[in-house]
């Protein structure tokens, strides 16, 4: 089965494959970027206020995604009675790319959701205890849904940026338990966001590394490494995928350096987008 960023050779011609690989060997990329350079990033927050408590549209070059956040009330898990729940899902539609198919979530959609979800969970982006309404009875449940609109590579990073921007701008009604019923207090709350972690994806092509791969670059990659980096430069999650090619420890160190070089600028874009809707 094809995996995200690891499609069959029929998707790209042999000539294109050789051309891209040859450029990389020469230290060049098809769009003229440096190996450690992201495409232009644009973030627009609160794009669907009527349908979500928080939302964001992200354009990463010619890749674009929208993330929407819904906050519901539910019961906590038995092993964490005083903690709320946060979950990331994704719906990959043929509208974004003919590579995506209608129907139940495929392996690539599940993988993408897991990677982005792990970045949120492992960094403890949301203070789970701050989502508790009444211990053991009711908590807030936060669902971040991602919808790719256009796909030209690196859905992971685009989705991560969109989810973080949407979470930062989420406002929802405060609820309380009264006579065993959930009722609104009339107040509005913001999510207890305590740590932002941005995911950075680096592709290995031959013995070279490039950050933020385009779709054509994903077609020829040997593998990729996705790293979640928080605001204190901590690496909170790592995931290798996109192919079975090996990646040495030296290359992993190099990839981590690329991520650290970019995290501050992207975080500033997210924070600026969030301030625009305050």
Regions found by a protein language model. Give the residues of each.
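Polyanion-binding surfaces on beta-sheet-dominated domains and ring/shell assemblies
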Residues: 2-278
